[in-house]
Amino acid sequence: MTELARLKFYATQPHTCSYLPEEQATTLFLDPSQPMDVQVYADLSDMGFRRSGDHLYRPHCQNCSACVPARIPVNLFVPDRQQKRILKRNADVQVQSARPAFTEEYFDLYQRYIEQRHADGDMFPPSREQFSTFLVRDLPFSRFYEFRVDQRLLAVAVTDLLPNGLSAVYTFYEPDEERRSLGRYAILWQIAEAARLQLQAVYLGYWIKNCKKMNYKTQYRPIELLTNQRWVTLY
C-alpha cells in the first residue's frame, strides 16, 4: 500500500460556496491527525489539494466542478507585454524570505488589504486571530516573502516551498499602491523564484471562470489546469 493510499479524508456537509453563492459546496479534508509531511503535501498538490492554516483540502462538490486546480509550468512561462511592464514598474522592490510570524507590521497591512479589497468576502472583518490561524503556522516549508521598497512593506506572499514547486497560499499587499499591480507582481516573482530554485511549477489554487476574483489566473500562459485527473496545458 502506498503512502497516499493510507491517508484518510473527511468530507464536510454541504454549505454555501464562498465563490459562487448560488451553489452548494462540499470540501474534502485530509485527516487533521495526519502530520503535515512535505512530500505528502506535494503529492496532494498534484491532485488539486491546497493548504489553509493546518489543513489540506480540495473541493468535493456533487453538482459543480467550477473550481479547477491551476499551476504554471515554470520552464514554459514567458511574460507577455503587460507583465513585462509590471516587472519593470517594480524593479525597485526588494524581496526577502522570513519565517511565518505575527507582527503588527504584517497585520496592519493585512487589515488594510482585507478592508479595502475584500470587504464583501467571508474574511471580513479581519482579526488578529483570523490572521494567525490562517497564515501564521509553524511549518518548516512555509515562507513569508516580504516585498519592500526602502524598508517599507508593500506586500507579503505566503508561500509553501515544496519538492515539486512553490504553492502560492495567499498574498496581501498595500491597496494604495494600485499602479504597481502588486498581486500580479508577486506571482511573477514567484515564477522567477521557482525557476531559480529549479522547481517545476507554481501552484495558484483554483481557477473559477465565473468568479472575477479567481478567473485572473489564466492571464499567465501557458497554464496547466487539472481536468479529469489530468493536467492539461493551455497556451
UniProtKB/Swiss-Prot annotation:
It comes from Pseudomonas savastanoi pv. phaseolicola (strain 1448A / Race 6) (Pseudomonas syringae pv. phaseolicola (strain 1448A / Race 6)). Keywords: Acyltransferase, Cytoplasm, Transferase. It is an enzyme of class 2 (transferase). HAMAP family: Bpt (MF_00689). GO terms for molecular function: arginyl-tRNA--protein transferase activity; leucyl-tRNA--protein transferase activity. It is found in: Cytoplasm. Its EC number is 2.3.2.29. Belongs to the R-transferase family. Bpt subfamily. GO terms for cellular component: cytoplasm. It comes from the Bacteria. It catalyses: N-terminal L-glutamyl-[protein] + L-leucyl-tRNA(Leu) = N-terminal L-leucyl-L-glutamyl-[protein] + tRNA(Leu) + H(+); N-terminal L-aspartyl-[protein] + L-leucyl-tRNA(Leu) = N-terminal L-leucyl-L-aspartyl-[protein] + tRNA(Leu) + H(+). This is Aspartate/glutamate leucyltransferase. GO terms for biological process: ubiquitin-dependent protein catabolic process via the N-end rule pathway. Functions in the N-end rule pathway of protein degradation where it conjugates Leu from its aminoacyl-tRNA to the N-termini of proteins containing an N-terminal aspartate or glutamate.
